[in-house]
Every structure is written in C-alpha cells, then in structure tokens.
C-alpha cells in the first residue's frame, strides 16, 4: 500500500486550524510563512486526496495591542480592528489561502462560544479566582499584556523573554519573574498592582496533559521539546484582564464590569471552534461542525509560528480537557458543544528573519504581504516559503535568494519545461500528439513522474513541505534532461518519434503541475488551461461582504484537481503559450524594491 493510500484510509474529515493574525496592522511575509502558506498547501493537498477539509481562521481583534494602535490612530478599538481585518482578509485572499471560513473575533457567535467554554471550565472547577500583581503602563494606567513585557529570562538568561514565556527555553513565566522587565510600548518599567482575576487551573490538568502529550510521538521535534519544557512547571494562567476592549466575563458581578474582560489569548484559541460553528451555519448545515470536533475519527492540524506553540500544544489542549471534564477535578462536557477533539498535530514553523532579525513590524524589519503581492504575485512568494522558508529552523530572507529562486528555479527550470513542451507541441501539431512505441527513456521518465505522487503525497501528508516541493522539482530536472537528450526539434524526419517525445513531455508537465497545485494554485490553473483544460482546476477563496465586514469562503468542491495522474487527451487543441513565470531584474538581488530596499537610508 502506498503512502498516499495509507493517508486516505485514515479518515475523511480533516480540520486545518490556522493561527489567527492580530488585527493591529497589515501582515508581513514572516506571518504568512508561519501560519498561511503551510496550512494552505496542506489543506489543498488533503482536498485533492479525497479528504473532507475544513480550513478555518480569522482576525484576532481584541486586547491591549488593538487599544494601543487605536489610540495612535485616533480611532476606537472597534474601528481599528475592523480596518485591519479588512486589509488582512484582502491580502490572504490575494495569496490564495483556501479558507472555508476566515472570520473575526468580533462576531456575536464567537463571544457566545467563548463564554460557553469559560462557563463550562468554571463549573467543572478548572477556573479559579485569585489575586495577583498585575502589570500596568505607568503613563496611561492601562494593563500591560504579558506579551507586551520583555526582560531577561530568570532560567536561561535570554534577553528578550516575554512576560508569558521564554521563546529560548520554552519556560512558562509571569511578568514579575523577568529580570529587568520593560514595556514593549514605551520601554518603561511596568507598575505592578494587586488585582483580582480568573485563572485556568493548569496544574489540575497537568497529569491528563502529560499523558496526552506522551501519545504525540509524531510531532515535530521543536514542538515536543517546547511542550515537555512547559509541562515541567505548569502554573495557573490568567484568563481575564483589566481592560475595556474584549469579551465580557460571564460571572455574576463581573458581567457588567466594563473594565474586566476575557484575556485575548483565551478567546483567540477558542476561535477555531467558533469559526467552525459559524461556517456550519453559513452553509445551512448548523451541525456540520460536529463532524470535525465531536467525531473521534476526525483529525485536526494546527498551523502557527513557533512563538504560539505554548498556546496550542499545552494551553488549548488543557482548555479542551477541562471543558470535557478530563482533569483531576472531573466534570462533564458542555451539553451544547459535546466532547471536543484534542489536536492531532501541531505544525509549527520557525521564524523568517531579515539580516538575522525576526521579521517584525515593531523592529522595522518588514515586508508587507500586500506590497509583495502587488509587485511579484502570489505564487512567487508561496514557492519561496515552501522551498526556502522556516519549516524547521530560522531562515533569513534576502532579495538575492528570492531572485535566485524565482529566476533559476521557477522561470528557468519549471517555467521553461512548461513553455518549451507546449510550444513545440503547438508548433508541430497544434494539439496534444499521440505517442508511438515507448523507449526505455520514455518509460523511465513516465515512471518517475508517476512515483512522484506517492513520494510527494506522503511528504505533504506529514507536513514536510520543503522535501515535497524539492522532490517535485527533481522530476522537473529529469524532464528537462530528457527533452535535451531526445532533441525533438531535430526529429522533423521522424514525426512519430517527435510526437512521442512531446506526448511524454506533456504528460510529465501535467503530472508535475498536479504536484505543484497545492504550492502554486494560481500558476497551476494557467498551466492546466495551457494544456487544453477547461473549468476550475484550483479554486480560489472569495471575499464576501456580510454584516458590514468581509469574510473569506470558497466553493472548493468545484475544482477538478485531484491527486494522481490525469492522462492527457490526444487531440486536445493547444494554443501558443505565454511565459508562466516572469523573470526578475537581476539588479533586484542587490537593491531590493523601492518599498523594501536592501540598505534603507
């Protein structure tokens, strides 16, 4: 049984839960290298393999960061969140991320589901009230989220540890633990005051969490390392904050307090569930979400950057265990939600850096997605992230490497194979020619391409994107070498052999295009049409205006792309092809574009 067959037998329902980008500004390429492109490659492959996929996410619209940005722009927090949600949704549509639903945390549905989870945890005994020393910005008196406080880790000495965890050693922290704490907003030392909050009682869930994590042997090593480090010293974690911008706390005496709200990290992770419920209602099947959340045979994959591992590998599973009543204190699942599935796999990427620094809005090392798409289109970025992105280690983005990848791999190798194969077939036949008797060289190339579906598919099923696209490009290299060796342009006196070579080349182009579809769906559609295909090969998300806010959805059932060889049809008319990939000016490697120069002055 092939690797692809084994995956297809596992289950039919696959949840692709994609980290929620924060709506306090446009997203940069570092963001989409962590959550965006990897999740879409995976979701598209799973759909092509016959799975029923639900890919959900949305804009994270609550919390102090939104309030701070709103103050800077002289607008309300609601207006700020709505503005950037609209920008982010448009960018993600342009990138071709095939969400079944991309929404936001501003919906009534999301508030209701968040409060239902909070209430069930509270009733099951996993939410406790206690006092703590809260951090406040001295200049404004506004609460400082843990992630807005930096300092030196008391465990490993890392200088840029955050108030909730150290990204270097993975240790869970409180702001008061940091050595030399400072506000990321102003650089001032925070003011600590006693305040009362509700906490998620993670110690009461520790044993269940440890037992569950021990079963996650196929997770990426970086995720397992972080998760085990976090389990060593679990402590209660605050899930409310002194802030007027957020979801109200569903507890008597707190519900009407305008200065108490649910902590943004808590409501954000619940977004995967609330978005699934919203999706089901929007398609007219209000219980369809249960097929992905209550069905024990369903599988769920969570995509994020490494700075979000803590929330997805330990805290979100802890919330789910507590909601299900599976911690030390027992309890019952929510009657409304039922028993909820825990994550099958956490697919975490490392950081994309620029000149060794993390791509960051606050640090000035930024290439915004919208700018990139406007100049280079989506597939150049998608390809770069897949083949050279931070899948397993921090990766430095340089314009030199980007230009090299586009010009020498996309244009010279893959684009050249497509264009010369179709051009020669059009020039000589004006249609897909029939193959005569096959030689060993013909069969060898066709067999290599056919085998690629198992190899590439098996890698994609295990979220090994870089290895998968590298294997597809290896087949491109074999095909180019085959054409160079067979020299069909010299076979005018042997048209049967010429047509056979061209038929083999076109079949391999079709095969590789299928393998490339999850990575580069826009160019895959063009190549499909260049081969005479009609209709939708790779569907794209649609931006839909609803209730005054945009969402992304898509009718992916209309697409014809499926995983495996599609035999080309002899006699299909061909047209003279246009180049699929535009070569970039070599000077760009040294200068960068005007909006993101290599050496900004």
Curated annotation (Swiss-Prot):
Monomer. The lineage of its organism: Bacteria, Bacillati, Actinomycetota, Actinomycetes, Propionibacteriales. Gene3D superfamilies: HUPs, Isoleucyl-tRNA Synthetase, Domain 1, Methionyl-tRNA synthetase, Zn-domain. SUPFAM superfamilies: Anticodon-binding domain of a subclass of class I aminoacyl-tRNA synthetases (SSF47323), Methionyl-tRNA synthetase (MetRS), Zn-domain (SSF57770), Nucleotidylyl transferase (SSF52374). GO terms for biological process: methionyl-tRNA aminoacylation. This is Methionine--tRNA ligase. Belongs to the class-I aminoacyl-tRNA synthetase family. MetG type 1 subfamily. The keyword Ubl conjugation does not apply. ATP binds at residue 361. Binds 1 zinc ion per subunit. Is required not only for elongation of protein synthesis but also for the initiation of all mRNA translation through initiator tRNA(fMet) aminoacylation. The keyword rRNA-binding does not apply. It holds the Pfam family tRNA-synt_1g. It comes from Cutibacterium acnes (strain DSM 16379 / KPA171202) (Propionibacterium acnes). Zn(2+) binds at residues 153, 156, 166, 169. Keywords: Aminoacyl-tRNA synthetase, ATP-binding, Cytoplasm, Ligase, Metal-binding, Nucleotide-binding, Protein biosynthesis, Zinc.
């Amino acid at each position: 049984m092939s690797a692809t067959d084994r995956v297809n037998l596992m289950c039919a329902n696959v949840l692709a839960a994609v980290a929620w980008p924060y709506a306090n500004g446009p997203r940069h390429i570092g963001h989409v290298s962590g959550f965006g492109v990897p999740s879409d490659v995976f979701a598209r492959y799973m759909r092509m393999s016959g799975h029923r996929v639900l890919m959900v996410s949305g804009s994270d619209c609550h919390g102090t960061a939104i309030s701070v940005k709103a103050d800077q722009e002289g607008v309300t927090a609601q207006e700020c969140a709505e503005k950037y949600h609209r920008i982010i949704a448009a960018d993600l549509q342009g990138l071709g991320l095939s969400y079944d639903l991309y929404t936001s945390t501003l919906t009534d549905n999301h508030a209701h589901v968040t409060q239902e989870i909070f209430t069930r945890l509270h009733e099951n005994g996993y939410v406790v009230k206690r006092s703590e020393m809260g951090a406040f910005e001295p200049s404004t008196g506004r609460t400082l989220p843990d992630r807005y406080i930096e300092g030196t880790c008391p465990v490993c000495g890392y200088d840029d540890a955050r108030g909730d965890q150290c990204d270097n050693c993975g240790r869970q922290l409180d702001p008061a633990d940091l050595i030399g704490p400072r506000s990321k907003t102003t650089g001032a030392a925070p003011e600590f005051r006693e305040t009362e909050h509700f906490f998620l009682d993670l110690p009461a869930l520790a044993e269940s969490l440890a037992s569950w994590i021990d079963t996650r042997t196929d997770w990426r090593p970086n995720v397992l390392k972080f998760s085990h480090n976090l389990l060593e010293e679990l402590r209660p974690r605050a899930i409310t904050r002194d802030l007027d911008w957020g979801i109200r706390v569903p507890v008597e005496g707190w519900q009407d307090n305008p200065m108490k709200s649910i902590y943004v990290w808590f409501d954000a992770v619940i977004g995967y569930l609330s978005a699934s419920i919203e999706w089901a209602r929007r398609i007219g099947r209000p219980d369809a979400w249960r097929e992905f959340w209550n069905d024990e045979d369903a599988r769920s994959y969570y995509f994020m950057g490494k700075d979000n591992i803590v929330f997805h590998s330990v805290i979100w599973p802890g919330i789910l265990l507590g909601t299900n009543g599976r911690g030390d204190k027992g309890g019952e699942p929510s009657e409304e939600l039922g028993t909820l599935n825990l994550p099958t796999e956490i697919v975490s990427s490392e950081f994309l850096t620029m000149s060794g620094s993390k791509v960051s809005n606050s640090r000035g090392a930024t290439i915004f997605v919208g700018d990139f798409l406007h100049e280079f289109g989506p597939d150049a970025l998608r390809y770069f992230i897949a083949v050279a992105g931070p899948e397993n280690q921090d990766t430095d983005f340089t314009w030199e490497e980007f230009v090299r990848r586009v010009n020498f791999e996309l244009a010279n190798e893959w684009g050249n194979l497509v264009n010369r194969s179709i051009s020669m077939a059009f020039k000589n036949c004006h249609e897909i020619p029939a193959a005569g008797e096959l030689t060993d060289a013909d069969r060898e190339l066709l067999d290599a391409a056919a085998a690629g579906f198992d190899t590439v598919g098996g890698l994609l099923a295990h979220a090994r994107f870089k290895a998968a696209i590298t294997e597809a490009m290896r087949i491109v290299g074999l095909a180019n070498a085959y054409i160079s060796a067979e020299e069909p342009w010299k076979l005018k006196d042997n048209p049967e052999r010429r047509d056979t070579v061209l038929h083999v080349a076109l079949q391999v182009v079709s095969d590789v295009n299928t393998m490339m579809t999850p990575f580069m769906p826009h160019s895959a559609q063009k190549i499909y049409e260049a081969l005479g295909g009609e209709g939708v090969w790779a569907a794209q998300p649609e931006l839909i205006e609803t209730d005054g806010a945009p969402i992304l959805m898509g009718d992916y059932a209309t697409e014809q792309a499926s995983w495996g060889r599609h035999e080309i049809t002899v006699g299909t008319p061909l047209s003279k092809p246009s180049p699929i990939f535009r070569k970039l000016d070599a000077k760009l490697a040294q200068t960068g574009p005007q909006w993101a120069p290599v050496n900004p002055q």
